[in-house]
Each structure stands twice: as structure tokens, then as C-alpha cells.
Amino acid sequence: MKKFSFSIVLCSLFFSGCAQDHGPKIQDELGPKYIYETVVDGIDIPWGMTFISDTELLVTEKSGILYHVMDGVKTELSGLPEIYVRGQGGLLDVTTAPDFETSRVIFFTASSSDGEAAGGHTALYNAELDGASLANLKQLYKGEGNTKKGQHWGSRISFDAEGHLYFSIGDRGNREVNPQDITRDGGKIYRLNQDGSIPTDNPFYNQKGSKQAIYSYGHRNPQGMLTHPETGAIWVHEHGPRGGDEINVIGAGKNYGWPTITYGINYSGTPITSDRDLPGLEQ
């Protein structure tokens, strides 16, 4: 099963840098040639997508619509939960279960207002694809600590070779508290079994007061995630501050430093920290 994200326009951009005395040089062309083709249009903010066959796609629209796409035609699917659309939040990633061809199960993340506090947080769901609708919808995880802030929800989903599910939640705009506190949701990569239960070998499973689903922490807004096809490692793209984007290979229990260390600055141009590297924090 093929998996692509971020765009409905399928394209490949090839580039290469050659180290020279005066710095890297970008080559204008590399063979073979690639072309791009518009598969479907009329989707305002496509957030995630996944192939369900060689000719069919599921595509999320951030405003809260899940589309089935085939032969250039998009069909809106029914059965989604209520989506809390605010700022960067809405309907986020979608992917298929490893056994999708037999189970017809999909997983997706979305902003949810469930809970007592006002506002929302990122939630993970699964459901069975049944024609043009979703059946047996289940909420597998919901971040606690709702907030009306509209930024940094994450979110992407991937699986390891053993079938564990990984998904991301951003710091929800509370960088001074959430990312470095393993008793709080936000700024984390999570690891679950596909039924929503928590693996007992998770790094903080036996730590009192911790969120047992946490796999790594110290993240700002992980908006890209893939499993390396050869090594099986989980690679995450971190949407950082200005000048502070990162690509990280995720390790169990590791602290990726946000906001204690960063190469970035605030979008306003003011500094966040002068620290770039500290003991116990991943680069």
C-alpha cells in the first residue's frame, strides 16, 4: 500500500547538492524526467491522504471532510465524529491499517472538543470503511488539557514492523509547559496498540503520573512521520520556529529538546534560547 501526504498533486522534485570550495551547488536537471498530474481538484486544504488501492485515495480536508477519490471524482464520506475546526486544527491525517485489505480499518487524527474544558485537543480514531460511510467509529486516544489556542495540533500516523501505531500531537501553543512534562499531553510522539491499548514496554509505562502512551517528548509540532522502509525507524519532521525545522529519528524515551534547545527564533525575530545542544537532549 502506497502512502503520500501533504498534497493532492502527485509530483516528484529531484535535486542534488555538490560540495565545492565555494559552497553547495544545485543541479538544474537530473534524469529521468518527472511529470506531475492533477488527480482531483476543488479541495481547499488537503491535510492527509492514503491509497486504499492502486487507483483509489482517501483524502482529508482540514475543514472536516473525508473524501474518497477515484478516476478524478471525489465523494464525501459520512460517519465522521464532530470535528473541532480552529486555527490549524481540523481533520488531520488518515492512513490504513496494515491489514486494511481484509479489515477495511482506517485510522485518522482530528481536533476534538471532547472533555470538560473549553477548546480542543488532538484525538486519534479508527473506523471501518463501508462503502461511502464509516462504521464502528472509535476514539482511541484524546489529548487532555483542552485549550482554545488554534496552533500546533500535529498530526501524523505511522506503524512499525510489529504493528504498533505511532502518532503525533504538537505542543498546542503552550511551549513552556507541555513539551517537557510527561504528565501532560502535547509536544509528544505516542505509541499504541492498534486497539488503543498501551504497550507495556512503552518507556514511561511504569512511571507514576506519566502519560503511559508517550514514546518521545520535547517536540514542537510534528507534522510529518514515516517509517523507514529498510531500517523500520520512525522518522519525524518537526515544524519548528523560524529557522528551526528538524528531521528526527525517534527513539524510545528520548527528549528532543523543545523549547530548551533550538536553532530557531520566534517569527517576530526575538530569541527563544541561546542553547543549541545540552546533555540528555537530542539534536
Enumerate the predicted regions with their spans:
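C-terminal motif of bacterial Sec signal peptides marking the signal peptidase cleavage site
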Residues: F15-G17
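Acidic, Gly/Ser/Thr-rich repeat motifs that build Ca2+-stabilized beta-propeller blades
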Residues: D21-R175, G224-T227, G232-G240
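Sec-dependent signal peptide recognition
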Residues: K2-V9
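Beta-propeller domain segments
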Residues: G23-I26, G89-L91, E101, R172-Q283
